[in-house]
């Protein structure tokens, strides 16, 4: 696991599968996503390595219902006064009240999807609570005016979070960064057309720092990279 300060107040937590991010406000910490089941101790250690205490965590925002994003949420939500937030359309899946929909895979995605699913641990997700359900345009209460951006397609209730004052985007799995460094629309989507439209919507934002659920964060040229990728997606 790596813990890297991307810009002041923002740390990147590289987990064994997927990523989490830690944002610091004067009144406490916000965690974006929580990794696979069993990730809570790793994230607690990451918070310490970032110079803070797990007890300072005030909210956990979940970008969508997949296990590599909500797996640690049940444990983390018990650390103290931690509010758990997610989009209303994914909330039933996160709470475990309904099974989440499977992706509509393109033929070229199937080998990668099968490989990824074989590598995931068998430990089941303990469904966490969701304290607050969000919709597009809601303010989750961190980052000097962060805004929830609905990006349906990867899942019905996928969310990104945009911090206008800091020009930081937490894209979840609505976007990704490939091994070659290129920004791309996320894969394994329940609605491929919807995912492409949501990705293009993100490209309209003024982005200085882009944080992905999979792939390295982008701290230079993010806006141009998104615009170029969106043009290819629309073509």
Q: Which stretches of residues belong to each language-model region?
A:
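Conserved beta-strand hairpin/beta-sheet module of binuclear metal-dependent hydrolase folds
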Residues: 2-50, 160-172
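Divalent metal-coordination and catalytic microenvironments
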Residues: 9, 23, 33, 43, ...
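Short, basic/glycine-rich phosphate-binding loops at helix/coil junctions
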Residues: 24-26, 113-117, 175-180
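Metallo-beta-lactamase
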Residues: 29, 36-38, 122-132, 138-141, ...
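Short, glycine/charged-enriched secondary-structure capping and boundary segments
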Residues: 45-47, 74-78, 98-101, 166, ...
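Core catalytic region of metal-dependent phosphoesterases/phosphodiesterases
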Residues: 83-85, 226-235
């Amino acid at each position: 696991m790596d813990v890297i300060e991307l810009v002041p107040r923002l740390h990147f937590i590289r987990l064994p599968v997927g990523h989490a991010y830690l944002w610091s406000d004067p009144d406490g910490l916000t965690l974006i996503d929580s990794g696979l089941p069993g990730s809570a101790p790793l994230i607690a250690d990451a918070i310490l390595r970032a110079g803070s205490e797990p007890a300072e965590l005030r909210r956990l925002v979940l970008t969508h219902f997949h296990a590599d994003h909500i797996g640690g949420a049940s444990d983390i939500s018990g650390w103290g006064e931690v509010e758990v937030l997610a989009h209303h359309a994914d909330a039933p899946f996160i709470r475990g009240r309904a099974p989440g929909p499977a992706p509509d895979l393109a033929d070229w995605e199937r080998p990668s999807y099968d490989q990824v699913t074989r590598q995931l641990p068998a430990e089941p997700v303990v469904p966490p609570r969701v304290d607050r359900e969000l919709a597009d345009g809601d303010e989750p209460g961190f980052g000097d005016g962060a805004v929830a951006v609905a990006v349906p397609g990867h899942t019905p209730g996928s969310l990104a979070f945009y911090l206008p004052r800091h020009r930081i985007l937490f894209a979840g799995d609505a976007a990704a960064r490939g091994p070659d460094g290129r920004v791309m629309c996320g894969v394994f989507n329940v609605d491929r057309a919807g995912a492409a439209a949501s990705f293009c919507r993100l490209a309209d934002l003024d982005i200085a720092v882009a944080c992905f659920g999979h792939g390295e964060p982008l701290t230079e040229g993010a806006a141009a990279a998104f615009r170029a990728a969106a043009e290819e997606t629309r073509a």
